[in-house]
C-alpha cells in the first residue's frame, strides 16, 4: 500500500527516468529550424560533418541531439514520416544500450533509425537483428532509404548468399539480418582456415528487434553447426515399430517435463519385443551392451508420446518441419538433435536423415553478450525485466504511447470444456461480424487453429486461417485482418511483425486488385487514390464498430505472448477490445493449473454452455503462468551457467585459431609442442628419481616411433653412465628435431610453414569437435552428482577444465605425430590448388538445428583451406605401413591414422 502511495505521489522509477530525457528532446527540437532550411545535398552532408567532428574528438553523446534531428528531418523528406517525441525517447534508450518497451503500432522500426544512424557514424558497423528474413529484407529496404539519403551504406544478410555477398553486407555501415544468420556466420568464421575467407566484422553495436523473442524465448536453443555421422536409419525404424506396440499402462508421461519413463511392466514388454527382434543383448534392457538401443528407445518414446503432429511439428513434402512454440512459425531447415528428429521421422514414416555431430556451438546469450553495446525493442519486456538485467545487464524502459490506449481488456470467460468454449467463441465472432467489427482469433497451435476453423466452417462463418502451413501469406493476411467484418484465425505468428491496419492496407490491396499497374504511372496513381479513399471510409466504419476485437482461445504459458496478442488491437489510440475464452481442457490449466479448485467451481451449479467470469480465475491463471515462466527462467539461467564454462574455453580456442591464421609462421609453436610431447613421453615411461631398470623401455620405444617418428638406440643410451630421464628426454628431442629438419630440407620454407599451419588448425578443429561432444555427454549426466551431495555446476566446471587440459595435450601430441610422419609424393608446387569445402556441413539449433543451404560457400570447415596451403598435408604411405596390435591399442577410432595419410584411423588402416 505504501509503495503504491509513493508511486502515485512521486511516480515510478521508469516515469522519472523518461522525464529525465525531456531536456534532450528540447535540444533536438532546437536544431530543427536550421535543418528544415537545408536543401537535400546540405542535409546529406551532415554525415560527413559528424564524422569529422568524431575524428576531432567529439563523442557520440555530444552529437546525439543534432544527429537525431538530422534523421528526423531525413525521414520526413524520404518516408513522409516524422518521429514523435516518444520515438525520440526510444532512440535515446537504444543508444544507451537499454531495452525500449513500446506498444504495438508505436513505430519501433522507425525508432531504430535514430540509434542506428548515430552509432554507424564511426564506421565500425551496426547490426540490426530481426526475427525473420522477411522483416530483415523489408526493413533494410524501407529504412535503408533514410540511411542512403544520408550517405550511409546498408547490407542485408539472408540465406543462400555467397561468402563474398556476406562480406559485402557486413562491410556496410548498417547490416540487417536475423539472429540465426548473424550467429551462424560467427561460428562458420571460426571454422575457416584463412582470415581472408571470414565474413563477420568485429562486434560493435547491435539493435535487436523483438528482443524478448531473441534473447529470452530462443535462449534455450544453442546455435550448433554439425556434420554427419554414421547412418542408423534401420535401427530407428525397428525401435519405432516396437514402441508403437506399447500401451499407456507401459509408461509414465510427465507433460511438464516432456519426459516418458517405462513402468516395470513396460520394461518387461519392451525386453520381450526387443529380444524377438534380435536387438537385445545380455538379457537385460539396461545391460551395458544395450546402451545404444536404450538411447534410441528413449527418443522413440518421446517422439511417439510427447511430441504431437501439428503442434510441435508438421509433415510437409515428406519432411518433418519444427514449429516454433513461441511464434507458431515453421522453422524450416532446423532439426532436433541427439537423435530426436530421426525418431520423429521414423514415427511419421518419412525418410530418415543421418544424425549429426557438433562441430561448433554457441548460445544466443553468449553471442549477444560479445557486443560492447546492445540495445533492444519490443512491445513486451517488463515481465522479464529481471532476467534482462541479470543475464544481459540491460534495463527495460517503458516508453509512453504517443496517444492514450483506448483498448478495453475484458475479463476471461471460463467454460467447462472445449466444445462449450468453441460454441461461445463462434457466437462472439458472429455478433462481431454482424456489426462489422474485425476479429483476430489467437490459437496456440496449428491443430487448434484448424479445429476451430472446421467448427466455424460448419457454422457457416466466413474466415481466413493463418498458421505455419500458410506462412507465405502471413504479411498479406495480417495486413488485411483489420478490414470491415474480417475474421482471421491465427497462431502466435500473428503477434509480431506486420501491423494490422484498420480498414485495410493500401500496398496489399494494390497488389491484389491492380497487380499489372506500374508504380509512377497515372493509372497507378489514380487507382491508389481511389483505394486510399475507400480505406479511409472503411476505417471509419471499423472504428464505429469498436475497432479490432482480439479473441484468445486459451492462455499461453508466457504472459508476454498473451500481451503480444492483445497488443495487436488499439494501436495509435484506436479503440479495440480483447477477451480470452478458457476451458478446463486448455493445456496450461490442465498441466499447471490448480485442477481440483477449477473442477469444484465447474461442477457447482454450472449448466452446459454457461461461463464463469471471475477475477479469482484470472488470478489463478496468472499464478500458473508465473510458475511456468519461473521454471523456464531457471532453465535458461542454467543453460547460460553451463555454456559460460564452454564459452571461456571457446574464446581460448577461437583466439588461438585467429593467432595461428595471422602468424606468418607457427614454427615456434610446433617446436614447443614437439618438446612438450617428447618430455611427456619420456616422463611417462621414466619417472623422476627412478633407476633405468625401472623404466618402461618397450612403451618408450613404441610411443617414440608412433608419435615422434624415431627409432633411436634406446638400449645403448640406457647403458650409458649417468643417464637419467632429463638427459634421455634431451636425446629423444634431438632425434625428433633431426627427423623434422630432414623433412624440411626437401621442400621450401613457404610450403613447410603452410603445412605446419594446416596441420595445427585441422588438429585443433578435430579435437575441439570431439571435446564438444564430450562436454555435451558430461552435461547430460552431471546432475547425478547431486545425489552425492555435490553441486552439479561446480562439478561440471571442474570436470570441463580437466577435459580441456587433456584436449590440449592431445592436440600437442597429434600435431607432433602428423608432422613426424608426413611424406611428400609430388612436387610442392603441385600443392597450390585448394580443395572445396565439403558441402555436407549442416547447422543445428539445440535441440533445434538449422541447416545452411547456401551450398556455394568459399569457406572451409573440414578440408585444408588457405591461400598458400598445400592441398594434401600428408601423402598416403601405402599398404606397406603396418599397424601392430600395440599401436592399435593406443589409437581411438577418430584419431588420425599414424601411416601419414591424413585420414581418420577408422577410415584408413583401422577400417573394418
Swiss-Prot record:
Topology term for the membrane: Peripheral membrane protein
Localization terms from the record: Cell inner membrane; Cytoplasm
Pfam families with a match to the protein in the record: P-loop_SecA, SEC-C, SecA_DEAD, SecA_PP_bind, SecA_SW
Catalytic reaction equation(s): ATP + H2O + cellular proteinSide 1 = ADP + phosphate + cellular proteinSide 2
SUPFAM superfamilies with a match to the protein in the record: Helical scaffold and wing domains of SecA, P-loop containing nucleoside triphosphate hydrolases, Pre-protein crosslinking domain of SecA
Enzyme class, broadest EC rank: translocase
Primary residence: membrane
GO molecular function list: ATP binding; metal ion binding; protein-exporting ATPase activity
UniProt keyword Transmembrane helix present: no
Entry's transmembrane regions: none
EC identifiers of the protein: 7.4.2.8
GO cellular component: cell envelope Sec protein transport complex; cytosol; plasma membrane
Biological process terms in GO annotation: intracellular protein transmembrane transport; protein import; protein targeting; protein transport by the Sec complex
Cofactor(s) needed by this chain: Zn(2+)
KW Cell inner membrane (keyword) present: yes
Residues binding ATP: 87, 105-109, 499
HAMAP family per record: SecA (MF_01382)
Family note: Belongs to the SecA family.
Subunit text: Monomer and homodimer. Part of the essential Sec protein translocation apparatus which comprises SecA, SecYEG and auxiliary proteins SecDF-YajC and YidC.
UniProt protein name: Protein translocase subunit SecA
Organism of this sequence: Rhizorhabdus wittichii (strain DSM 6014 / CCUG 31198 / JCM 15750 / NBRC 105917 / EY 4224 / RW1) (Sphingomonas wittichii)
Encoding gene (name): secA
Amino acid at each position: 500500500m505504501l509503495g503504491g502511495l509513493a508511486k502515485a505521489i512521486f511516480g515510478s522509477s521508469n516515469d522519472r527516468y523518461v522525464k529525465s530525457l525531456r531536456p534532450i528532446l528540447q535540444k533536438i527540437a532546437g536544431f530543427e529550424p536550421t535543418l528544415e532550411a537545408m536543401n537535400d545535398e546540405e542535409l546529406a552532408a551532415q554525415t560527413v560533418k559528424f564524422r569529422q567532428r568524431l575524428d576531432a574528438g567529439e563523442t557520440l553523446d555530444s552529437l546525439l541531439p543534432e544527429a537525431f534531428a538530422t534523421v528526423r528531418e531525413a525521414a520526413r523528406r524520404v518516408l513522409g514520416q516524422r518521429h514523435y517525441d516518444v520515438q525520440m525517447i526510444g532512440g535515446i534508450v537504444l543508444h544507451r544500450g537499454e531495452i525500449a518497451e513500446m506498444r504495438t503500432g508505436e513505430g519501433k522500426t522507425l525508432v531504430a533509425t535514430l540509434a542506428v544512424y548515430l552509432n554507424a557514424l564511426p564506421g565500425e558497423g551496426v547490426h540490426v537483428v530481426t526475427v525473420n528474413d522477411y522483416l530483415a529484407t523489408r526493413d533494410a529496404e524501407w529504412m535503408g532509404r533514410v540511411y542512403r539519403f544520408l550517405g550511409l551504406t546498408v547490407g542485408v544478410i539472408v540465406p543462400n548468399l555467397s561468402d563474398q555477398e556476406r562480406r559485402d553486407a557486413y562491410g556496410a555501415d548498417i547490416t540487417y539480418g536475423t539472429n540465426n544468420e548473424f550467429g551462424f556466420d560467427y561460428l562458420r568464421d571460426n571454422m575457416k582456415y584463412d582470415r581472408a575467407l571470414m565474413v563477420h566484422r568485429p562486434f560493435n553495436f547491435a539493435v535487436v528487434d523483438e528482443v524478448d523473442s531473441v534473447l529470452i524465448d530462443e535462449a534455450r536453443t544453442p546455435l550448433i553447426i554439425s556434420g554427419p555421422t554414421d547412418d542408423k536409419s534401420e535401427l530407428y525404424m525397428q525401435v519405432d515399430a516396437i514402441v508403437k506396440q506399447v500401451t499407456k499402462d507401459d509408461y509414465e508421461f510427465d507433460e511438464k517435463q516432456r519426459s516418458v519413463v517405462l513402468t516395470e511392466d513396460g520394461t518387461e514388454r519392451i525386453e520381450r519385443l526387443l529380444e524377438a527382434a534380435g536387438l537385445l543383448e545380455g538379457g537385460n534392457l539396461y545391460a551395458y551392451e544395450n546402451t545404444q538401443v536404450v538411447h534410441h528407445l528413449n527418443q522413440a518414446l518421446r517422439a511417439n508420446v510427447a511430441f504431437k503432429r501439428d503442434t510441435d511439428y508438421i509433415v510437409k513434402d515428406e519432411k518433418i518441419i519444427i514449429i516454433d512454440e513461441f511464434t507458431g512459425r515453421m522453422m524450416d531447415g532446423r532439426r532436433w538433435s541427439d537423435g530426436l528428429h530421426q525418431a520423429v521421422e521414423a514415427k511419421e514414416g518419412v525418410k530418415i536423415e543421418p544424425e549429426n555431430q557438433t562441430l561448433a556451438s554457441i548460445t544466443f546469450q553468449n553471442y549477444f553478450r560479445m557486443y560492447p553495446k546492445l540495445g533492444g525493442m519490443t512491445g513486451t519486456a517488463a515481465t522479464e525485466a529481471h532476467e534482462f538485467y541479470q543475464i544481459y545487464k540491460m534495463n527495460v524502459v517503458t516508453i509512453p504511447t504517443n496517444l492514450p490506449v483506448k483498448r478495453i481488456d475484458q475479463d476471461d470467460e471460463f467454460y467447462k470444456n472445449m466444445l462449450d468454449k468453441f460454441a461461445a467463441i463462434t457466437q462472439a465472432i458472429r455478433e462481431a461480424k454482424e456489426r462489422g467489427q474485425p476479429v483476430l482469433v489467437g490459437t496456440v497451435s496449428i491443430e487448434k487453429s484448424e479445429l476451430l476453423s472446421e467448427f466455424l466452417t460448419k457454422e457457416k462463418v466466413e474466415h481466413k486461417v493463418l498458421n505455419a502451413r500458410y506462412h507465405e501469406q502471413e504479411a498479406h493476411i495480417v495486413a488485411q485482418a483489420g478490414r470491415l467484418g474480417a475474421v482471421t484465425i491465427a497462431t502466435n505468428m500473428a503477434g509480431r511483425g506486420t501491423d494490422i491496419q484498420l480498414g485495410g492496407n493500401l500496398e496489399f490491396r494494390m497488389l491484389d486488385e491492380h497487380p499489372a499497374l506500374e508504380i509512377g504511372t497515372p493509372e497507378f496513381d489514380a487507382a491508389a487514390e481511389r483505394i486510399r479513399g475507400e480505406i479511409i471510409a472503411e476505417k471509419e466504419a471499423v472504428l464505429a464498430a469498436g475497432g479490432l476485437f482480439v479473441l484468445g482461445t486459451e492462455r499461453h504459458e508466457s504472459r508476454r505472448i498473451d500481451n503480444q496478442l492483445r497488443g495487436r488491437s488499439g494501436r495509435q489510440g484506436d479503440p479495440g477490445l480483447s477477451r480470452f475464452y478458457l476451458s478446463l481442457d486448455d493445456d496450461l490449466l490442465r498441466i499447471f493449473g490448480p485442477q481440483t479448485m477449477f473442477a469444484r467451481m465447474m461442477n457447482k451449479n454450472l449448466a452446459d454452455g454457461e461461463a464463469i467470469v471471475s477475477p479469482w480465475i484470472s488470478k489463478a491463471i496468472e499464478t500458473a503462468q508465473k510458475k511456468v515462466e519461473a521454471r523456464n527462467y531457471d532453465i535458461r539461467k542454467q543453460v547460460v551457467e553451463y555454456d559460460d564454462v564452454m564459452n571461456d574455453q571457446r574464446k581460448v580456442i577461437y583466439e588461438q585459431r585467429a593467432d595461428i591464421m595471422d602468424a606468418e609462421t607457427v614454427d615456434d609453436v610446433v617446436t614447443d609442442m614437439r618438446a612438450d610431447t617428447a618430455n611427456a613421453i619420456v616422463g611417462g615411461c621414466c619417472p623422476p628419481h627412478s633407476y633405468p631398470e625401472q623404466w618402461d623401455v618397450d612403451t618408450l620405444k613404441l610411443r617414440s616411433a608412433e608419435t615422434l617418428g624415431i627409432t633411436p638406440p634406446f638400449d645403448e643410451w640406457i647403458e650409458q653412465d649417468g643417464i637419467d630421464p632429463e638427459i634421455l628426454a634431451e636425446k629423444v628431442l634431438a632425434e625428433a628435431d633431426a627427423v623434422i629438419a630432414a623433412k624440411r630440407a626437401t621442400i621450401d620454407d613457404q610450403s613447410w610453414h603452410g603445412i605446419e599451419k594446416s596441420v595445427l588448425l585441422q588438429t585443433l578443429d578435430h579435437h575441439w569437435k570431439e571435446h564438444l561432444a564430450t562436454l555435451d555427454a558430461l552435461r547430460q549426466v552431471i546432475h547425478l552428482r547431486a545425489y552425492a551431495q555435490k553441486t552439479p555446476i561446480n562439478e561440471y566446471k571442474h570436470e570441463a577444465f580437466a577435459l580441456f587440459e587433456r584436449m590440449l595435450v592431445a592436440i600437442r601430441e597429434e600435431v607432433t605425430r602428423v608432422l613426424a610422419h608426413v611424406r611428400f609424393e609430388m612436387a610442392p608446387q603441385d600443392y597450390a590448388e585448394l580443395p572445396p569445402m565439403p558441402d555436407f556441413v549442416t547447422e543445428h539449433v539445440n535441440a533445434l538445428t538449422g541447416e545452411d543451404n547456401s551450398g556455394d560457400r568459399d569457406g572451409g570447415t573440414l578440408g585444408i583451406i588457405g591461400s598458400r596451403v598445400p592441398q594434401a598435408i600428408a601423402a598416403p604411405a601405402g599398404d606397406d605401413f603396418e599397424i601392430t596390435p600395440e599401436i592399435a591399442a593406443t589409437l581411438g577410432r577418430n584419431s588420425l591414422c599414424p601411416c601419414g595419410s591424413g585420414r581418420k584411423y577408422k577410415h584408413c588402416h583401422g577400417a573394418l
